[in-house]
């Protein structure tokens, strides 16, 4: 399994190809491709590359799926015995980013197409009339 740890919006995030993540707002519109160079760690089948502070030659490519707003956070301030109360709400602007590929030194380690091929199909159990029993 290949994954990387990136830094975006002042936060560190573990990402894998073929998954989407909600991160702080990025400039760009829906469908734009984004390249992230702030890669702190890359792991590929037991081979770990740790940056000091960044991994040289590592690149994460993704596509902006949509812009959205996070859950509302209520900020409530109160001074006891003074009848002073303030209630404010805040919703963080977010970007949903689909990770397309993880590459190191020009070699693609994981991509969206590879992750779709590698996932096994879910087994569906078939129910036939012979296996059902009626209770009287």
From Swiss-Prot:
**Keyword hit for rRNA-binding:** yes
* InterPro entries on file: bL21-like, bL21-like_sf, Ribosomal_bL21, Ribosomal_bL21_CS
State if Lipoprotein is listed as a keyword.
no
Q: Which Pfam families match?
A: Ribosomal_L21p
| One MF term in the entry's GO annotations | rRNA binding
The record's SUPFAM superfamilies line, in alphabetical order, gives: L21p-like
Superkingdom assignment: Bacteria
Gene Ontology CC terms, in alphabetical order: cytoplasm; ribonucleoprotein complex; ribosome
Q: Which UniProt keywords are present, listed alphabetically? A: Ribonucleoprotein, Ribosomal protein, RNA-binding, rRNA-binding
> What biological processes does GO assign it?
translation
> Could you describe the subunit structure of this protein?
Part of the 50S ribosomal subunit. Contacts protein L20.
Tell me the function of this protein. This protein binds to 23S rRNA in the presence of protein L20.
**Family named by the database record:** Belongs to the bacterial ribosomal protein bL21 family.
Protein's recorded name = Large ribosomal subunit protein bL21
Task: Identify the species of origin.
Answer: Trichodesmium erythraeum (strain IMS101)
The lineage, from the top, is: Bacteria, Bacillati, Cyanobacteriota, Cyanophyceae, Oscillatoriophycideae
